[in-house]
Amino acid sequence: MTYDLYIGDRTFSSWSLRGWLMLHKFDLPYRAHMIGLYGGTMAADMAPLAPARLVPALRTPEGDVIGESLAIAETLAERHPNAGLWPAEPAARIRARWLCAEMVGGFGALRGGCPMQLAYVDADFVPTDAIKADLARVETLWAFAREKAVDGPWLFGAYSLADAFFAPVCARIAGYNLPVSDAAQAYCHTTL
C-alpha cells in the first residue's frame, strides 16, 4: 500500500514540505515524484493528475487522486487511524483541525513578504506591521494549542498534522530572523 506523492522542491515550496511531512513523519509508505514548479513544466507534470493542479497531490494505492493539503491530511488520517496524525484527545483534535484550516487560508502577509526557503538566513530582514500581526496571530494559535498539549515538545504534545502544517512558518521565522517569543523560538528550533 504505497502512495505516490507529487511535490516540488521542499527547500522552497511550503506546500510541498507540508505534503512530504504528512507522509514522512508518520512513516506512511510513499514514492515522491518531483514536479517542475520553477522550470516551466508544472502544467505538463500535473496533467496526469487532473483535476489536481497544485502541489501537493497524492495518488492512493487504488489510483484515486487527492489535491489540496487538508483533503490529503483528512484522507490519510481516515485511512491510518492508528498512526496518530491528529491528536487522540477530542478537544485537542478539534483545535488541531482549526489550526490547520487557518494555516491554509491565512497569514497572507507572512507568506507574501517572507517566501518559504530553507537555503539561507536573511538576518537583515525588517518585517512590516502586517507580518508582525501575522506572527502575533501565529503565537496566539500556538499558545492555544499548547493548552491542550500533553507531554512533549510539539503543539499538542506528540507530533501531529498541525506541526506539519506549521513547519513552513518555522522556516520563515528562522530564515528571516523574525521577532517572536522565546517559546515560539524554542518550538521552531524543535521543528527545524
Where are the regions a protein language model picked out?
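GST-like domain detector, emphasizing the conserved glutathione-binding G-site
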Residues: 1-128
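GST-like fold's C-terminal all-alpha helical module
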Residues: 107-192
